[in-house]
Amino acid sequence: MDYIVFDLEWNQCPQGKAKENPRLPFEIIEIGAIKLNENREETGRFHEVIRPLVYRRLHFRTKEVIPMSQEELMGARTFSPVVRDFLHWCGEDCKFVTWGSLDLNELQRNMDYYRINNPLPYPLFFYDLQKMFSLLYDDGKSRWSLEDAVKYLGIPQSLPFHRAMDDTFYTAAVMQKMDLPAVCGYESIDYHRLPQTKQEEIFRDFNTYTKYVSRPFASKEEAMSDKTVLSLRCCCSLPVLKRIRWFSAGTGTYLALIQCPRHGYI
C-alpha cells in the first residue's frame, strides 16, 4: 500500500458569494501530491496547476494567500484531464493523507460538477494528519497550522507555504517525523458520499470513542424516531446506569447524557 499525501488550492467566485455557483463554491486550481511507500519513503510526485472554467479570475483572498499569477492559470490544463491523470497516478492500493479534512471533499465535489466517475472506495477512510498530530502532541481537539507543526518538529523551512506542492512537501515531512503507529487507528471518514441505506451505515470503534455515520433522513422527526440514532451506549458496551435522552441544544445540535459504570458521565 502507498500513502498519497496531497494538498489542493482552490479559488472562489471573485464577485462574491451572491454570484457563486452553488454546485461549485470552490474550484480547484492546483494539485500537489507525494507518494510514500509503507516505510514512508518517497517514491513519486504529482503536481499540476489547473485552468479554471467557472471562476476564471482569482478572488482577492486567493491572491492574498496563494502566490500564483493569472498567466500561470491560463496556460494550464483544465480539471478533467488533470484529475484523471492524478487518480491514475495514485493507483488502486493507496491511502490518502491530508492536512485537515476538506481536501477530499472538495476533490470529489469538483469531480461531481464535471461529471467524472468517482473511483474512490466507499466508505473512504483517510488520514487527517492535522487531527493525528494533535492526538500525539496536544489534546486531540486543537488544530495546529501546518507551519506551526513544521516548526514544532524542527523541520527546516526551505520552501514557502501556500502552494500545493510546497504544503504537500511539508505534510509528508511531518508524517515522516511522527510516531504514526501510535495514532494510525484514528482514521477519518470521508462524508462526501453518505450511506444511502441502513446496510451501508458506518460504525467505527476507536477504543476511546465510537463513530456512527447514518444514512440521510428526510426530516429531523424521522431521524429522531430511528432506534439506532436514538440508542445511547458507551464504547465499552457496559450497560448504562442513568441516561438523559436526546434533547435540542439549538442550531441543529442534539445532546444526550449517560452514566457508564466504568467511565462515568458521558
Locate the predicted segments by residue.
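Conserved non-catalytic scaffold segment of RNase H-like nuclease domains
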Residues: 2-108, 265
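Beta-strand initiation motifs
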Residues: 41-44, 117, 121
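Acidic two-metal-ion nuclease catalytic site recognized across multiple nuclease folds
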Residues: 177-266
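Acidic, Mg2+-coordinating catalytic module of metal-dependent nucleases/exonucleases
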Residues: 95-101, 106-111, 145-207
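Conserved beta-strand -> loop -> alpha-helix junction used to position metal-binding or nucleic-acid-contacting
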Residues: 119-133
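Short, glycine/acidic-enriched loop or turn micro-motifs at the edges of active sites
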Residues: 10-12, 131, 170
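Active-site flanking residues adjacent to catalytic metal/cofactor-binding acidic residues
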Residues: 6, 127, 166
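Active-site-proximal helix-loop-helix substrate-binding element of RNase H-like nuclease domains
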Residues: 57, 61-63, 70-73, 130-168
